[in-house]
């Protein structure tokens, strides 16, 4: 399974990249807004920010359109695609979005169909030619719905028909989401920086390391004697 980081923060991306396990990046307007210095960011600055991300990570970088109409999505998406060959156009799963995804697919532009909350949405996006589809598991969990069940359904459907659209598990809240995604056969998990940090941690590892270090001190003292 591939690991993407879900952030627009350059420092977080650089730190995650140092681990050597990062395969790509996903961003959205909310994540970009977090890094805006004065509460807003120009569109040119946004494009420049995406370019900087592409320089850090040699892998897919999802940049989301902010328009809601098909024609406007197409214009915006084609402009974003020119930034770098690794840019993937992130499009919400709406009627207009599906039309835009179909257009991008015909033009050979990679897309990430986002805000998927049902199997039917994912299937429709795949039929339109989406490169990726992003089901949001955490947000479903928030409303007492099993988000991982959606992943299981989508993965099963896509396997039935050898659909090439890759499943990106999004809205990841904890390491359990990542592990379950891998067990279900999802292609990608896009993970916030804080959760990536949690993946490597376990209290028994900390206790074991503490014991090893104590024993190492005994060995060193014995050598001196």
Curated annotation (Swiss-Prot):
Active-site residues, Swiss-Prot/TrEMBL: 90 (schiff-base intermediate with substrate)
Pfam families per the UniProt record, alphabetical: TAL_FSA
Key word Membrane present: no
Main location per the UniProt record: cytoplasm
Disulphide-bonded residues: none
Superkingdom of the organism of origin: Bacteria
Residues spanning the membrane: none
Swiss-Prot/TrEMBL keywords: Cytoplasm, Pentose shunt, Schiff base, Transferase
UniProt-annotated location(s): Cytoplasm
GO CC term (a single one): cytoplasm
Free-text function comment from the UniProt entry: Transaldolase is important for the balance of metabolites in the pentose-phosphate pathway.
Name of this protein: Probable transaldolase
Native source organism of the sequence: Chloroherpeton thalassium (strain ATCC 35110 / GB-78)
